[in-house]
Amino acid sequence: MDGDIAAGKMASPVCAMAPLDSMEVLDLLFDRQDGILRNVELAEGWILAREEQKVLLNSDSDEFLNCILGPGDSDPSSPLWSPADSDSGISEDLPSDPQDTPPRSGTEPANTVARCHTREQGKGPCPSYLPSTPCPEPPRTQVQESSVAIDLDMWSTDTLYPEEPAGSPSRFNLTVKELLLSGGSGDLQQHSLAASQLLGPGSGHCQELVLTEDEKKLLAKEGVTLPTQLPLTKYEERVLKKIRRKIRNKQSAQESRKKKKEYIDGLENRMSACTAQNQELQRKVLHLEKQNLSLLEQLKHLQALVVQSTSKPAHAGTCIAVLLLSFALIILPSISPFNSNKVDSPGDFVPVRVFSRTLHNHAASRVAPDVTPGSEVPGPWPDVGTPHKGPSSGGLSADWGNFLEIPMLDNLTEELDNSTLVLANSTEDLGRATLLDWVASEPLLSPGRVGLEIPGEMWLSWVPRWLRVRLVQDALGVL
């Protein structure tokens, strides 16, 4: 009952106070009027130690206080704090500033005092001031270490811990409670009851433990029941940590399976698309192969036709016919075998009047005498190279001899030669009978007419006989 009263007194001041000094903590704990531990019964050895402390010298007193208040002399295996390698949440956090945890500084000296008087003489860190009587151990109860440690890292601050005000109590208030209850009964159930009273709804400092459905299911499956209020014991923390680890592993496995399923579905879709595309390409390849085979067959057929056409030899008769045709096309225009038939028809031939300028002038200046037909006597053939020396018998022959003896004989001869060439060219197409008719003597001039007028039928009658004969011979030679 005394422990409950002390716990009720220290709930609000200790949690709300600022970081205190060691002496203030001692005064707060051991003051006879207002101290928290004034009603707690101490062991007999502890009372004797306090009486002896009054009579000690200042040096012994300082040594005793250093033994009590020295942080380095405290037992590292204290059951009130979790070791650094434990699974609790306190061990995972970085060591905090001593000013942030004032209750611990108040509990360490008390524990140290309790331990100093339980050791034998000459063996403990504190010397015994009663040489014959050892310090008896004060009655205390073994408290589980897990009643202090709280894993804050494993619990989400959004779901488990609401935002605390500036004056919220520290999580180490439980150690002060244990210190207060250390002199009381040793039943663990009383400690749990005191903790529930300390963090109950009436105190205003309790924090509820919020569990998800999965956590509740796994806890029920494990057969563990967790309290709804904080803090938890170390065993409960380990169980909760294990449950949450399982939940995280389950969630990660579900996400992994989901991603794997999505990846496999994507691969299957791609595989189906690739399979359809592959089938389409195979159909196209088969179609192209068929077209290629048909084209190859057509090419072979064309090659066979070309080989057959080139292997046939050229016939000799065809070559001879081509040569004869070409020769005939070259030779036939110069032969003209149809000229006689053309000359026989009188309508096909049109006489052409050919005049010599010199002969025309001389003939125009003279008046031909009347000549009767048949009066011309044929004389000897005149020699072209020798001039005539005298007149020949017959008027026409004499006239032609005098004409040939004029000084312009050379020019006349050249003109006659030119006329002969023209006449020769014009008489190539005449027949032999026509040329023989020209050789016969005919009068050059009609009786009673002046000048040379050649009738249309006999356009060459003005040419001398010997010249006509020569022209006829030349024409016959060509034929």
From Swiss-Prot:
Pfam families with a match to the protein in the record: bZIP_1
Q: Which domain of life is it from?
A: Eukaryota
| Gene3D superfamilies for this protein | 1.20.5.170
Q: Which InterPro entries match?
A: bZIP (IPR004827), bZIP_sf (IPR046347), CREB_ATF_subfamily (IPR051381)
Q: Where is this cross-link: Glycyl lysine isopeptide (Lys-Gly) (interchain with G-Cter in ubiquitin)?
A: K290
Could you list this entry's UniProt keywords, alphabetically sorted. Answer: Activator, DNA-binding, Endoplasmic reticulum, Glycoprotein, Isopeptide bond, Membrane, Nucleus, Signal-anchor, Transcription, Transcription regulation, Transmembrane, Transmembrane helix, Ubl conjugation, Unfolded protein response
Q: Where is the composition biased (Polar residues)?
A: 98-110
Q: Name one GO molecular function term.
A: protein homodimerization activity
> Could you tell me which residues belong to the region Leucine-zipper?
281-302
User: Might you report a single GO cellular component term?
Assistant: membrane
Keyword DNA damage annotated = no
PTM per Swiss-Prot/TrEMBL: Following ER stress a fragment containing the cytoplasmic transcription factor domain is released by proteolysis. The cleavage seems to be performed sequentially by site-1 and site-2 proteases.
Specify the inducers.
By IL6. Pro-inflammatory cytokines and lipopolysaccharide activate the UPR and induce cleavage of CREBH in the liver. Down-regulated in the liver during fasting-refeeding. This down-regulation may occur at the postranscriptional level and may be mediated by SYNV1/HRD1, which induces CREB3L3 ubiquitination and proteasomal degradation.
Q: Which residues lie on this side of the membrane: Lumenal?
A: 339-479
Which residues are on the Cytoplasmic side of the membrane?
1-317
* Membrane-spanning residues: 318-338
Specify the bZIP domain's residue ranges: 239-302
Q: Give the UniProt subcellular location, in the record's own words.
A: Endoplasmic reticulum membrane
Supply one GO BP term: response to unfolded protein
Membrane-topology annotation of the record: Single-pass type II membrane protein
Q: Give the knockout phenotype.
A: Knockout mice display decreased triglyceride clearance from plasma resulting in hypertriglyceridemia.
Q: Which residues are glycosylated?
A: N411, N418, N425
Cite the residue spans of the region called Disordered. Answer: 67-144
Protein family according to the UniProt entry: Belongs to the bZIP family. ATF subfamily.
Assembly information from the UniProt record: Binds DNA as a dimer. May form homodimers. Interacts with ATF6. Interacts with SYNV1/HRD1; this interaction leads to CREB3L3 ubiquitination and proteasomal degradation.
Q: What is this protein called?
A: Cyclic AMP-responsive element-binding protein 3-like protein 3
What organism is this sequence from? Answer: Mus musculus (Mouse)
